[in-house]
Amino acid sequence: MKTKAVRLYGKNDLRLEEFELPQIREDEILAKVISDSICMSSYKAALQGETHKRVPNNVAENPVIIGHEFCGQIVEVGAKWQDRFHPGQKFSIQPALNQKDDPYAAPGYSFQYIGGDCQYIIIPAQVMELNCLLDYNGSAYFYGSLAEPMSCIVGGFHASYHTQQGSYVHKMGIVEGGACALLASAGPMGMGAIDYAIHGDRKPSLLVVTDIG
């Protein structure tokens, strides 16, 4: 079937094209993309092209589909996955596959037939094998697209740690009732961080937000 996509060929070389998708194999899934939010890391990949760590060196000959914050609907399921997924099912995706043999490979950077800026995609076997194709039951597709950036925000909070004098035990996340500063945080990700700080399980007593003047 034919599909349209924004494909990356190299540094500053993005092209909106129509091309033919191959027939899916028994370990693949055909899906329709409904929403895809734009990440600054996609912009970085477009600037760096094949020098980006997630973009293949042969992207000029085998272009990749850009966009990794996407949500959609399954169209056709290969035989291997028919006990887990079905046509019409809504999905979102965890693009950071973290494969042992290729840790930087990710949808939206590294694959010819899967990415968010596309009408129809072929989801490769490793996405399902690594449990990165996620069942989605939200009220709107754009919420599913925002799952990945919000997970990055939550991960950032949980990567922050505190210690007490004389102890090397790391206490992760916000200190209940403590102070929190979010720098350069009036953009989309900053707004998400503010939302999480205010509505998370542990709340700071003081939240200071700054942005670039």
Regions found by a protein language model. Name each.
Residues K2-K4:
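Extreme N-terminal starter segment of soluble prokaryotic enzymes
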Residues V6-L14:
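Extracellular beta-rich ligand/substrate-recognition surface
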Residues P22-D36, T51-L97, I114-G115, L134-Y136:
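Glycine-rich beta-strand-centered segment in the early N-terminal region that forms part
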Residues K44-H52:
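Short Gly/aromatic-enriched secondary-structure transition segments
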Residues W81, S160, Q164, A197-D201:
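Active-site catalytic pocket residues across diverse enzymes, especially alpha/beta-hydrolases
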Residues P95-A179:
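NAD(P)H dinucleotide-binding glycine-rich loop of Rossmann-like/cofactor-binding domains
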Residues C152, P188-M189:
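Hydrophobic/small residue at the entry helix of a nucleotide-binding pocket
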Residues E176-G178, L183, I194-G213:
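Adenosine-nucleotide cofactor-binding segment
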